């Protein structure tokens, strides 16, 4: 299995990074915190023109999400990309709106909020901790019963939920006889893909914490020397870099396993989630420490990655659930 990036993936990375550097500097990420969904419309349309919602293979989508995570991009990117995958080949207005960046889609993946009921095409029930719920125009529900596309119309109520991560707001979505469209997609495959792409987004954030720490360690001086010359700081940065590479390797392996339909795909996805969550939580905390007292201030961006790491740990296939899955798979082996 070749895990090295292809020239096409390198080209995607360069293109996406240039776009995000121009359109989503950290100042704009901060400005979008608490903004309504309409504030995202120009960004979504520009991203669609660049092909963000095109039908790429999972390994190429992973590159996209690494860059989104590196930029700490706010908004329901994961839900929209997974919805585009579920709608691939569709020709109706709903599909065209997603592909064209006119519709933002939030993903209802984690079964938090109790069971959902579907009767005569009408959905009822609640999903909590839905990332980007308040910014979405529609919802993609991935459930044991199948894959449902639900426009945000009558019968759909969204309530904002207090969240540690202001760059990635969450909400509670209540469906009351909401109209749905059942999609002929494999729910298990979409679930695996969603967790892999969430891991890829985390990998980008993990890598960015390494960059931030190394950059700061080169310029911040104590006792007449850059702090990066001191063993305590340089070893911490080295440990961060190792965790970043482990997380990236596990996520690439999981992406390839899912793409190729490997028998152990579920196992690899769970491993990637656990390793990425552990790495992100630790790297984000170490990044704050490497910045010293400044790292604890609102003005320093380090705390934003701490908050994103906490949100990643608890959503889109939470780490604790993946650990339970790994234990069950080991016992069944």
Regions found by a protein language model. Give the residues of each.
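Glycine-rich flavin
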Residues: 21-160
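Well-ordered beta-strand segments characteristic of repetitive beta-sheet solenoids
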Residues: 141, 174, 200-203
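Residues forming anionic-ligand binding surfaces in small-molecule and nucleic-acid pockets
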Residues: 188-189
């Amino acid at each position: 299995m070749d895990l090295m990036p292809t020239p096409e993936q390198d080209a995607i990375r360069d293109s996406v990074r240039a776009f995000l550097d121009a359109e989503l500097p950290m100042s704009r990420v901060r400005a979008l915190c608490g903004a309504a969904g309409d504030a995202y419309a120009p960004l979504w349309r520009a991203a669609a023109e660049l092909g963000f919602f095109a039908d790429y293979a999972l390994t190429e989508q992973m590159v996209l999400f690494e860059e989104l995570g590196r930029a700490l991009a706010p908004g329901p990117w994961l839900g929209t990309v997974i919805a585009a995958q579920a709608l691939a080949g569709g020709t109706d207005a709903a599909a065209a709106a997603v592909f064209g960046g006119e519709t933002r889609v939030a993903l209802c993946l984690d079964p938090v909020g109790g069971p959902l009921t579907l009767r005569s095409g009408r959905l009822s029930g609640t999903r909590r901790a839905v990332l980007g719920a308040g910014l979405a125009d529609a919802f993609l529900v991935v459930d044991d019963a199948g894959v449902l596309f639900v426009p945000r119309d009558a019968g759909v109520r969204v309530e904002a939920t207090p969240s540690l991560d202001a760059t990635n707001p969450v909400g509670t979505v209540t469906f009351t006889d909401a109209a749905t469209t059942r999609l002929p997609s494999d729910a298990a495959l979409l679930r695996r893909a969603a967790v892999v792409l969430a891991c890829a987004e985390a990998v980008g954030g993990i890598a960015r914490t390494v960059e931030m720490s190394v950059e700061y360690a080169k310029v911040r001086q104590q006792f007449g020397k850059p702090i990066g010359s001191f063993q305590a700081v340089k070893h911490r940065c080295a440990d961060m870099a190792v965790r970043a590479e482990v997380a990236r390797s596990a996520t690439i392996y999981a992406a390839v396993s899912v793409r190729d339909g490997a028998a152990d795909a579920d196992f690899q996805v769970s491993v990637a989630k656990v390793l990425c969550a552990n790495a992100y939580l630790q790297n984000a905390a170490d990044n704050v420490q490497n910045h010293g007292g400044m790292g604890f201030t609102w003005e320093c961006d380090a705390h934003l990655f701490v908050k994103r790491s906490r949100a990643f740990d608890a959503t889109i296939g939470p780490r604790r659930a993946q650990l339970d899955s790994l234990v069950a798979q080991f016992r069944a082996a």
